[in-house]
Amino acid sequence: MAFTPFPPRQPSSSARLPLTLMTLDDWALATISGPDSEKYLQGQITADVSNLTDAQHLLAAHCDAKGKMWSNLRVFRRDGGFAWIERRSLRDVQLTELKKYAVFSKVTIAANDDLVLLGVAGFQARAALAPLFAALPDAATPVVSEDATSLLWFEHPGERFLLVTDVDTANRVTDALRGEAQLNNSQQWLALNIEAGLPVIDSANSGQFIPQATNLQALGGISFRKGCYTGQEMVARAKFRGANKRALWTLSGTASRVPEAGEDLELKMGDNWRRTGTVLAAVQLDDGQLLVQVVMNNDMEPDSIFRVRDDAGSLRIEPLPYSLEDA
């Protein structure tokens, strides 16, 4: 029996978020298994999975030969192989690309829609989950596995948990939290990812950016010491030759509409407006505030004013919860 997604409601900012249980249907799961799974994945993505323990997860990019990202992936070990979470809109394309050379390796690469992705965040999220599992992940142990469940811990913008689990456990968690937690869909998790400065690559922006343009180097998503992987030459060139001139920014403010992924924004230049950037994701919160994640030049002035194209509202830069200085 399939798990029924929760109905949508306007997302809240992390500062005002009550205990919330979310179905993450806009994200999707994929796996690689088999004797060559580690070697194969290591040759395809930007992060070093050979050093990944069972208690860790990491962000990585899967690039084309030009170093442009098909997708970014949240990778962790599961069931003797690896699993990763990415946006559902581009999973099929990403898996098609990943499988291109798999015929030469002993691996099985597959989408997995049998398992359920849940998010738990907001007021006293840890206390709410604690009675339901023997142990919860934390900063020292960001992944905990229990039976069919992988629990992933995230620090920003406030402590939150991502559960990869079977339908029975998802129903058990939902039944336990239904009375005290508000229910929501993927949009709330998306809003939290935007606040956290975690890049959201959907199909509209697949194949458009090198990893550094979305701050992956600052998020531990690129190893410059590992062996070859697809697109490595271009990714390395961006670092060592200073070829990357873009960065991911979080903006907040107001607008009469929510911009789509792939749109540009406008930057105020004196009395005029100039088109700039590419929107990765945007969400309107329950207080009317608009959050926008956008890739722009990495030398933007912190007091710059932006707007959704031809809109009366305005957007300003929000600080990221991590530094780009040494990235």
Curated annotation (Swiss-Prot):
Question: In the UniProt record, does the keyword tRNA processing occur?
Answer: yes
Q: Extract the InterPro entries matched here.
A: GCV_T_N (IPR006222), GcvT/YgfZ_C (IPR029043), tRNA-modifying_YgfZ (IPR023758), YgfZ/GcvT (IPR045179), YgfZ/GcvT_CS (IPR017703), YgfZ_barrel (IPR048451)
Q: List the disulfide bonds.
A: none
Enumerate the UniProt keywords alphabetically: Cytoplasm, Folate-binding, tRNA processing
In this record, what's one Pfam family?
Answer: YgfZ_barrel
Q: Where in the cell is it found?
A: Cytoplasm
The molecular function GO annotations come to:
folic acid binding
Where mainly located?
cytoplasm
Q: Which GO terms describe its cellular component?
A: cytoplasm
Q: Please tell me where folate binds in this chain.
A: W27, W189
Q: Does tRNA processing show up as a keyword for this record? A: yes
- SUPFAM superfamilies in UniProt: Aminomethyltransferase beta-barrel domain, Folate-binding domain
Which GO terms fall under biological process for this protein?
Answer: iron-sulfur cluster assembly; RNA modification; tRNA processing
Transmembrane region(s)? none
Known role:
Folate-binding protein involved in regulating the level of ATP-DnaA and in the modification of some tRNAs. It is probably a key factor in regulatory networks that act via tRNA modification, such as initiation of chromosomal replication.
What family does the entry list?
A: Belongs to the tRNA-modifying YgfZ family.
The entry's protein name is tRNA-modifying protein YgfZ
Native organism is: Klebsiella pneumoniae (strain 342)
